[in-house]
Amino acid sequence: MCIRDSNKVVGEWLAKQGYDYIRPEFTYGKSRIDFYMEKGEQKYLLEVKGCTLEVDGIGYFPDAPTERGVKHLHELAQAQQAGYRCAVAFVIQMEGITEVRPNVSTQPEFGTALAEAKAAGVRVLFLLCRVGRDSLEIVEQREG
């Protein structure tokens, strides 16, 4: 599975969540956020992160340094303060994993940015998946 698979499966999942409007690849600030949605008058931003690293039954992100991921978290925190409802969704691409933690040994800045985003009101979602040889399906959502 790759990042495109994560975004595709989240797009399919979002279509079932009752939004009035969904737009992928939305520019906010200096970033391209994975999804912009509307429900009534409320505006939402969602950034998707695919989690494929597991250590002792826990998912970790990122598996390699991602300056872009840090930047996206800062943009989401700013958007949350500007009135958007924002979330980062970790698509867990391994069965049996129910949470994702920041991989601070690989990139401590991501852990700091995630904590700051949460403090600003950005929701953290864990999207648990059923993984097949050629398929990926979201089967459960948990809050982080």
Residues of each region from the PLM?
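Conserved small/polar residues in nucleotide/adenosyl-binding loops
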Residues: M1-S6
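A short acidic/basic microdomain associated with nuclease active sites
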Residues: W13-Y28
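Short, structured patches in soluble enzyme cores that scaffold and shape functional sites
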Residues: F26, M37-K39, V48-G50, F90-I92, ...
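Charge/polar-rich, low-complexity and marginally structured segments
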Residues: F26-G29, I33, T66
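Conserved catalytic cores of phosphodiester-cleaving nucleases, focusing on short active-site segments
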Residues: F35-D63, L76
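Nucleic-acid nuclease catalytic cores
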Residues: G57-E67, A77-T106, L128
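A short, acidic, amphipathic alpha-helical segment used as a generic capping/interface helix at domain edges
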Residues: V70-Q78, E109-A113
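Domain-level recognition of nuclease-like catalytic cores that cleave nucleotide substrates
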Residues: Q93-G144
